[in-house]
């Protein structure tokens, strides 16, 4: 793939053989962003698990203290009073059979979903559409619930879901390049703590194998996966 001049210039500032501290990586990500807008900062983590085995699946939710820098669009499957509760909490799309039908026709203009338990039989009809996109409501992540208002408010406030893919990778947005160093590091710390907390007992060997920071359309920055504490401390030059 042919890279842009801006991308190549940014990549020259990064030593691919070095493992940067998270703080240095955040600063490099901001410095090497190649977009004219505030780019998204994403973290890719390679885990030492075999996702093909049910007892090594890694998934969960985390409340990022500073959000992602984006107000996610939330679709809610609910009816009656619960639909009204969802709307009052700030849900962007609320429906039941009608919302299922729209999604079957190709509508996917939302970032997260929530459903009341009584709606799940209907939502099951579009599981093949929502599931592969990580959009299927799930009681384990608090998105199948009767407390619709809180679920919507949590997502709007920075709660994100994560799930390991078939290759053992996790991708998490920790903010944008206009965030402060501290905001990005605190979001990363919150995500990392939760990922470590849900480590499967069946996972053997090294759990955090590889960590990479990157901005939208920017080069990857290798990060030391062993740096998991006191991340706001200045790094010590080697």
Curated annotation (Swiss-Prot):
Gene3D superfamilies: 3.30.190.20, 3.40.50.790. Keywords: Repressor, Ribonucleoprotein, Ribosomal protein, RNA-binding, rRNA-binding, Translation regulation, tRNA-binding. It holds the Pfam family Ribosomal_L1. One of its GO terms (molecular function) is tRNA binding. GO terms for biological process: regulation of translation; translation. It comes from the Bacteria. One of its GO terms (cellular component) is large ribosomal subunit. PANTHER family: 54S RIBOSOMAL PROTEIN L1, MITOCHONDRIAL, LARGE RIBOSOMAL SUBUNIT PROTEIN UL1M. Binds directly to 23S rRNA. The L1 stalk is quite mobile in the ribosome, and is involved in E site tRNA release. Belongs to the universal ribosomal protein uL1 family. NCBIfam families: rplA_bact. Part of the 50S ribosomal subunit. This is Large ribosomal subunit protein uL1. It comes from Frankia alni (strain DSM 45986 / CECT 9034 / ACN14a). The lineage of its organism: Bacteria, Bacillati, Actinomycetota, Actinomycetes, Frankiales.
């Amino acid at each position: 793939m042919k890279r842009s001049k801006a991308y190549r210039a940014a990549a020259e500032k990064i030593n691919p053989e070095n493992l940067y501290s998270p703080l240095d990586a955040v600063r490099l990500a901001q410095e090497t962003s190649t977009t004219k807008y505030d780019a998204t900062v994403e973290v890719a983590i390679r885990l030492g698990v075999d996702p093909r085995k049910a007892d090594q699946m890694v998934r969960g939710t985390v409340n990022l203290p500073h959000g992602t820098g984006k107000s996610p669009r939330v679709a809610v499957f609910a009816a009656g009073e619960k639909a009204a509760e969802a709307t009052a909490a700030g849900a962007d799309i609320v429906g039941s059979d009608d919302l299922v039908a729209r999604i079957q026709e190709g509508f996917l203009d939302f970032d997260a979903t929530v459903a009341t338990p009584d709606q799940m039989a209907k939502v099951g009809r579009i599981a093949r559409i929502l599931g592969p996109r990580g959009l299927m409501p799930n009681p384990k992540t608090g998105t199948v619930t009767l407390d619709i208002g809180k679920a919507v408010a949590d997502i709007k406030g920075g709660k994100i879901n994560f799930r390991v893919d078939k290759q053992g990778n996790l991708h998490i947005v920790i903010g944008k390049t206009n965030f402060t160093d501290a905001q990005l590091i605190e979001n990363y710390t919150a995500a990392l703590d939760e990922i470590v907390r849900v480590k499967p007992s069946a996972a053997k060997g090294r759990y955090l194998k590889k960590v990479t920071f990157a901005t939208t359309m920017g080069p990857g920055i290798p990060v030391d996966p062993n740096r998991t504490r006191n991340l706001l401390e200045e790094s010590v030059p080697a």
